[in-house]
Design a protein with these regions (language model features):
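Donor-nucleotide binding loops and adjacent catalytic segments primarily
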Residues: 1-53, 86-90, 98, 102-111
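Short glycine-/small-residue-rich Rossmann-like dinucleotide-binding loops
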Residues: 16, 59, 77
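Acidic donor-binding loop of glycosyltransferase active sites
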Residues: 46-62, 71
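Short alpha-helix at the nucleotide-sugar/activated-sugar donor binding site of glycosyltransferases
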Residues: 48, 66-67, 72-74, 94
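Short hydrophobic beta-strand element within catalytic cores of glycosyltransferases
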Residues: 56, 72-83
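Two-component system phosphotransfer/interaction surface
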Residues: 108-120, 149
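A short, well-ordered alpha-helix in the C-terminal region of glycosyltransferases
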Residues: 124-138
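C-terminal alpha-helical cap of glycosyltransferases
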Residues: 137-154
Length: 154
């Protein structure tokens, strides 16, 4: 966290309940106003809107949201999921140059460097944003509801 402060990076950190107290302690220890923690962010679209770079797990719902948002993304797939599906999700975006992948086991050593490198590369930030935005499934709700209605009619 100290390095974020040194680089004048502002962080909106959704910690989850289990890490919330520890995160508050860590931030208090470095006395940084630029880092805020939340056990859960109810209006995530506001946090996404404020972000220049988003760091996220790689679940299907998160990736769907990130495609709509169209911001540069660093994905850290959870290793604690069935059939390593988050890694596969993340890798599919990486293969389309739409995200950066950092393995969970490497995150403590590599994540900060990746954030700083990305922040200092506006060309890559723009490229990642454009590529992930292209993956947005437009009108998904209409497609799903039409499909469901067609199933009911059968």
């Amino acid at each position: 966290l100290e390095i974020f402060k040194q680089h004048n990076l502002n962080i909106i950190w959704q910690t989850g309940k289990s890490f919330s107290e520890k995160a508050h302690e860590l931030i208090a220890a470095i006395n940084s106003r630029g880092i805020t923690t939340h056990s859960f962010i109810k209006e995530i679209e506001l946090a996404y809107g404020l972000a220049d770079i988003i760091v996220s797990r790689a679940g299907a719902i998160a990736i769907s949201e990130l495609c709509v948002v169209g911001k540069p993304v660093i994905l850290i797939p959870s290793p604690n999921v069935a059939e390593n599906h988050q890694y596969k999700n993340a890798q599919s975006l990486v293969n389309k140059n739409a995200a950066i992948l950092v393995k969970d086991s490497k995150a403590s050593n590599k994540l900060v460097d990746e954030i700083i490198k990305l922040q200092n590369n506006p060309i890559l930030m723009k490229e990642l944003s454009e590529n992930i935005k292209r993956m947005e499934f437009k009108n998904a709700a209409n497609v799903i509801s039409d499909y469901a209605l067609n199933l009911i009619k059968k």
